[in-house]
């Protein structure tokens, strides 16, 4: 922007021209304005709001971390708004969280808080929590030591650490689909090549990987139990086949097992249980069983991998909150976590059955689904041709009902993820009736 001539400014502000000259010299010395000989005096662009905004936008394009797809951004923005019904939300409702147990664990932690140094933690995590996780893993047939366990700020954080600290650039990631990992960009930030294996075709994973057998830098990412979003699980035979193939071709497996403790029938073993050569990197979290805000998960891997990740961790954030780790440890030590799990499984199974009963009454002619034996989700796939994006926006704008459409998880089916974990039964019923009404209308 060009500023008026000195004479005009002196008249406009009723001051001496010398005052204007000195003011211009001062502003120019500070960099606010600049003079072009023969042209005039101009305000520097960086003071222009539009210019600043454009510059920030330009700089953000340089980021190695891609932004989420628009639908995911919108869901993330609305998920904290209590005025909506969140029929797809992937967390426990407030009534299912262990408030009393958490309060007691926090009180126990506070009683010996003076023993804490409150300095920076190491990258491995709280020793007592790592030790008790080792004990629990042993009871599930996974025999590891403290040196094989690292505490993280949740499962997704664990995957991010593996992406930058274990997998090389331009790696090939073979993963099951649909998967919540598709709603993130965690494997895209380092130019990883993503190869999808449909969950219902997992028996063909060997054939698919064989096409890339000459690529040295590759890994398998898989959710073996109660996949998010479909709720499906691998059979024990499928798990054995995957680990056998992994060992034969020296391909690491990233096992994302966040719903490991939420089962409604006899639990099945993790892939890590069959791991004899240390090929499986096992990931889990307390976010789905206690609360997302607790932000505590863990990685089980070979000592060498854990050492590498801990070093990377110290370059990023110096470790997870020691207080959160101590609270989780207290819940595990006094067995209140296990008591909470017994009740949680019972309530979630009951809520699952409530949702399935409504689906059977309303949707059996227009959709199909499977009965999950654990986790949070029912995967609803429509038999009829329907515009899922249109359904998403109609329910959002007219009914304040938020659904997670299947396409954000990499699904090509006309599908939505339903959750029985977050909303009350009353809201579940209301939302399903509204979805049915709009589907029939469309």
Swiss-Prot record:
Keyword Transmembrane (UniProt): no
- Give GO BP annotations, semicolon-separated: alpha-amino acid metabolic process; biosynthetic process
What Gene Ontology molecular function terms does this protein carry? DNA binding; DNA-binding transcription factor activity; pyridoxal phosphate binding; transaminase activity
Carrying N6-(pyridoxal phosphate)lysine, the residues are 288
Give the coiled coil ranges.
none
Tell me the cofactors it needs: pyridoxal 5'-phosphate
Q: Does the keyword Cell inner membrane apply?
A: no
What the entry lists under Pfam families is as follows: Aminotran_1_2, GntR
DNA-binding residue intervals: 6-25
- Identify the SUPFAM superfamilies for this entry: PLP-dependent transferases, Winged helix' DNA-binding domain
Question: For the HTH gntR-type domain, which residue ranges apply?
Answer: 2-46
UniProt keywords (A-Z) are: Activator, Aminotransferase, DNA-binding, Pyridoxal phosphate, Repressor, Transcription, Transcription regulation, Transferase
Relate the protein's function as given in its record: Positively regulates the expression of the NorB efflux pump and negatively regulates the expression of the AbcA efflux pump. Binds specifically to the promoters of norA, norB and norC and abcA genes. Could also have an aminotransferase activity.
Similarity comment: family membership: In the C-terminal section; belongs to the class-I pyridoxal-phosphate-dependent aminotransferase family.
Know the name of this protein?
HTH-type transcriptional regulator NorG
Which species does this protein come from? Staphylococcus aureus (strain N315)
């Amino acid at each position: 922007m060009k500023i008026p001539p000195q004479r005009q400014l002196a008249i406009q502000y009723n001051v001496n021209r010398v005052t204007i000259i000195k003011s211009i010299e001062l502003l120019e010395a500070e960099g606010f304005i600049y003079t072009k000989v023969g042209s005039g005096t101009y305000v520097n662009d960086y003071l222009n709001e539009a210019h600043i905004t454009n510059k920030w936008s330009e700089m953000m394009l340089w980021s190695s971390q891609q932004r989420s797809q628009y639908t995911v951004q919108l869901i993330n923005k609305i998920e904290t708004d209590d005025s909506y019904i969140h029929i797809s939300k992937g967390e426990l409702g407030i009534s299912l969280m262990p408030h009393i147990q958490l309060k007691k664990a926090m009180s126990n932690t506070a009683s010996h808080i003076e023993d804490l140094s409150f300095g920076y933690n190491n990258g491995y995590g709280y020793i007592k929590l790592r030790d008790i996780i080792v004990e629990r893993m042993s009871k599930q047939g996974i025999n590891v030591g403290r040196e094989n366990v690292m505490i993280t700020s949740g499962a997704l954080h664990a995957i991010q650490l593996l992406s930058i600290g274990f997998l090389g650039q331009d790696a090939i990631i073979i993963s099951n689909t649909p998967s919540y990992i598709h709603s993130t960009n965690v494997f895209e930030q380092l130019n990883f090549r993503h190869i999808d294996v449909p969950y219902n075709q997992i028996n063909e994973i060997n054939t698919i990987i064989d096409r890339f057998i000459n690529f040295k830098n590759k890994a398998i990412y898989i959710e073996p139990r109660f996949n998010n979003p479909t709720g499906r699980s691998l059979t024990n035979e499928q798990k054995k086949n995957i680990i056998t193939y992994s060992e034969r071709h020296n391909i690491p497996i990233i096992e994302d097992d966040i719903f490991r403790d939420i089962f409604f029938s006899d639990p099945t073993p993790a892939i890590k249980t069959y791991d004899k050569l240390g090929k499986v990197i096992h990931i889990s979290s307390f976010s789905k069983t206690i609360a997302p805000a607790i932000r505590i998960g863990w990685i089980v891997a070979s000592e060498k991998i854990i050492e590498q990740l801990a070093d990377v961790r110290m370059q990023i954030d110096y470790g997870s909150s020691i207080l959160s780790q101590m609270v989780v440890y207290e819940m595990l030590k006094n067995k209140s976590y296990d008591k909470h799990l017994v009740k949680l499984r019972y309530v979630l199974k009951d809520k699952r059955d409530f949702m399935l009963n409504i689906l059977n009454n309303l949707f059996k002619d227009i959709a199909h689904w499977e009965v999950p034996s654990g986790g949070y989700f029912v995967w609803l796939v429509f038999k009829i041709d329907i515009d899922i994006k249109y359904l998403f926006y109609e329910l959002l704008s007219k009914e304040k009902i938020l659904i997670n459409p299947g396409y954000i998880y990499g699904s090509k089916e006309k599908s939505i993820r339903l959750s029985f974990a977050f909303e009350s039964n009353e809201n579940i019923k209301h939302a399903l009736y509204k979805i049915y009404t709009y589907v029939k209308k469309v």
